């Protein structure tokens, strides 16, 4: 996939850890439903399993010509030739990741605008703020004040995503903040119909959030 000119925006699916038989089916159905980007996130499996799963998820993403990211593991992203990697403050330092990885880099900025400014200056291609709601994916995570998003593009030019507990019921909360996309986990992975869930989220995102940017 050629990355030049690719706008990082839209509906961003972050996976659960690989554990269930229908893991790959969920991802493919979600893509059919409208997911624009997939990030493989797995905190529990050994590296050998993660390598195999990453390759399979990448094949699915390539089939539909959508961006494929790896969470945290820059070396794994290099090995499977992922389009991008997403890191945070507890992972490889951003300047180091930028030196060794030629693809796209996303950076978690939590509720910290200064961290977003740092990320842009050090080569990040997008930032992710949140969570702004309680989330089952990270039960102990702090919940941040949504007002950190106000006028965010006065401070940075790279795309801004939001993540954490976002679902069809609260996605409109982000209308008017100028964000570029939302990232979800449970809103798709916990839904019995991932394709429908993705389609509804995509419609709400484009009709009420991105249209108000």
UniProtKB/Swiss-Prot annotation:
Q: What cofactor(s) does the depicted protein rely on?
A: Mg(2+)
Example GO molecular function term? thiamine-phosphate diphosphorylase activity
How the cofactor is bound: the record states: Binds 1 Mg(2+) ion per subunit.
What keyword terms does UniProt attach to this protein? Magnesium, Metal-binding, Thiamine biosynthesis, Transferase
Binding of Mg(2+): at which residues?
A: 72, 91
**UniProt binding sites for 4-amino-2-methyl-5-(diphosphooxymethyl)pyrimidine:** 39-43, 71, 108, 138
Q: Quick one: a GO cellular component term?
A: cytoplasm
Query: Into which EC class is this enzyme placed?
Result: transferase
Query: In what pathway does it function?
Result: Cofactor biosynthesis; thiamine diphosphate biosynthesis; thiamine phosphate from 4-amino-2-methyl-5-diphosphomethylpyrimidine and 4-methyl-5-(2-phosphoethyl)-thiazole: step 1/1
User: What catalytic reaction does the record list?
Assistant: 2-[(2R,5Z)-2-carboxy-4-methylthiazol-5(2H)-ylidene]ethyl phosphate + 4-amino-2-methyl-5-(diphosphooxymethyl)pyrimidine + 2 H(+) = thiamine phosphate + CO2 + diphosphate; 2-(2-carboxy-4-methylthiazol-5-yl)ethyl phosphate + 4-amino-2-methyl-5-(diphosphooxymethyl)pyrimidine + 2 H(+) = thiamine phosphate + CO2 + diphosphate; 4-methyl-5-(2-phosphooxyethyl)-thiazole + 4-amino-2-methyl-5-(diphosphooxymethyl)pyrimidine + H(+) = thiamine phosphate + diphosphate
List GO BP terms, alphabetically.
thiamine biosynthetic process; thiamine diphosphate biosynthetic process
Q: Do you know which PANTHER family this protein is assigned to?
A: THIAMINE BIOSYNTHETIC BIFUNCTIONAL ENZYME, THIAMINE-PHOSPHATE PYROPHOSPHORYLASE
**Record-stated family:** Belongs to the thiamine-phosphate synthase family.
- Known role: Condenses 4-methyl-5-(beta-hydroxyethyl)thiazole monophosphate (THZ-P) and 2-methyl-4-amino-5-hydroxymethyl pyrimidine pyrophosphate (HMP-PP) to form thiamine monophosphate (TMP).
Q: What is this protein called?
A: Thiamine-phosphate synthase
The lineage is: Archaea, Methanobacteriati, Thermoplasmatota, Thermoplasmata, Thermoplasmatales
Underlying gene? thiE
């Amino acid at each position: 996939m050629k990355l030049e000119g690719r706008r990082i925006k839209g509906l961003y699916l972050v996976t659960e850890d690989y554990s269930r038989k229908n893991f790959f089916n969920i991802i493919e159905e979600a893509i059919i439903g409208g997911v624009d980007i997939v990030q493989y996130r797995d905190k529990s499996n050994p590296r050998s399993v993660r390598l195999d799963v990453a390759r399979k998820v990448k094949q699915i993403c390539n089939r539909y010509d959508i961006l494929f990211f790896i969470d945290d593991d820059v070396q794994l992203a290099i090995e499977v030739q992922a389009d991008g990697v997403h890191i945070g403050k507890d992972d490889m330092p951003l300047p180091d990741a930028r030196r060794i990885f030629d693809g796209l880099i996303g950076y978690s900025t939590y509720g910290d605008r200064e961290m977003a400014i740092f990320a842009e200056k050090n080569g990040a291609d997008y930032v992710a703020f949140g969570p702004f709601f309680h989330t089952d994916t990270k039960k102990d995570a702090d919940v941040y004040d949504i007002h950190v998003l106000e006028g965010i593009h006065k401070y940075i030019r790279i795309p801004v995503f939001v993540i954490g507990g976002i679902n069809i019921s609260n996605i409109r909360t982000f209308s008017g903040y100028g964000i570029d996309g939302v990232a979800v986990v449970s809103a798709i992975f916990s839904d019995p119909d991932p394709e429908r869930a993705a389609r509804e989220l995509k419609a709400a995102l484009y009709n009420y959030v991105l249209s108000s940017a």
